[in-house]
Amino acid sequence: MNRTYIQEVPKEIGNTIKVQGFIENLRNSKAMAFIVLKDITGKLQITVEKADHPELVDTIDKLTPDSVITVTGKVVENDYVKMGGIEMIPSEIEIESIADALPIVRKEIAATKKKKAVERSSIDQRIDYRWIDLRTDENQLMFKAQSCFVNAMRKFLLDRSFIEIHTPKLIAAASESGSEVFKVDYFDRNAYLAQSPQFYKQMAMAAGFERIFETGPFFRAEKSYTNKHSTEFSGFDLEFSYITSYRDVMKMEEELLTAGLKAVKEAYGDQIKELFGQEVIVPETPFPVVKLADLYKGLEEEFGYTVDESEKGDLTTEAERLSYEWVKKHYNHEFLFITDYSAEKRAFYHMRDENGVPQGYDLIWRGVEITTGAQREHRYEVLKKQAEEKGLAEDVKFYLEFFQYGCPPHGGFGLGIDRLTMLLCGLSIKDAEFLFRGPNRLTP
């Protein structure tokens, strides 16, 4: 008999089927046993009257929460069952795996007249046993929503003639800042783990691919202990040619994110609201845009927030947070494009205008930066000069060669998939990654 997923069980009323999954809840009394069985698609109550099925009693007495079982039985309607008014009356229960007592508490347990409350284990304790923690409804919903988000963005790009590529993660030179890379031994020389696919995205433009994107792992050797940074993360990057300005890049990104959020809201919006208390809002386009200097002026006027002149070329962490309050008040929006950063704070490959202003932006969602995007400098001599200004020309010599033999104007951006997930569900980065990596975390 083939396995039936639990979400398909309502179609099988009156039929005998086979289901498989983890035991989420177990109540075993003298006369009755109730098992809540969970698979990746849903939950089903298994009801056993022991007098009617004495052959199952020994098996039921061996069961523990989180054990894995296969159950064969008849699907019947029962209006008293909370899970859709459906239950299964088993004829056979097969134990696939018995679970020991769990080493973590995944959810806080409220106090009763007979028992004290039990606190939820800390996030670090839960990461120690992440495979157990991931069985919760919240975690499985989070990754379903993430999968939906990424798939919708991928479809959006494929429908617009983008090509998906996969670039090297072992590289000869740092693509961003040399102080933030992991150095690894590569036979008789040093190599680095890629911080981004930036150089190779642009190589694809020089190759005439015109429109590309990539999803993959990237690495940052930052000793940061915030709730939004990790040393390994999943990126969603794209680059495309024949743009007229960085505004074309901004337009592409806002349409991409809107498509992703629309898909998530349709598929999982109600569940995200129920389990995480977060409203999935499909944003209106175009997104609000503000120059960095004007944002600082607005934050000072409305929140009394000021920074030294030396800091005004970049966005501070506090300004990033306050920008959400500012954009909600002025535009009733969750997203904000910020432009006109200092050239000192931007990568050497960002194009600059006649006044030396980088032609790029940051995108903030719910008070957290999710993107840096820009029009790239594709003119060899100009790009070489900008690399020399930052003392990088020799280190990125191979990259500069991409632009010696013809290259169209182009631009792009990168998104952190984990950070998108974190903000979507209102979590920390430790909760939002399948397995978090940080300065003090390299296992499991």
Label the model's feature ranges.
Residues 2-243, 435:
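Class II aminoacyl-tRNA synthetase-like tRNA-binding/catalytic domains
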Residues 108-110, 269-271, 419:
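Juxtamembrane/interface motifs at transmembrane-helix termini
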Residues 164-166, 272-276, 338:
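Cytochrome P450 heme-thiolate monooxygenase catalytic core
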Residues 180-262, 285-444:
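A translation/RNA-centric and nucleic-acid-associated enzymatic feature enriched
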Residues 259-273:
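Flexible helix-coil linker/hinge segments at domain or subdomain boundaries
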Residues 271-285:
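Short, highly charged C-terminal tails/helix-capping segments
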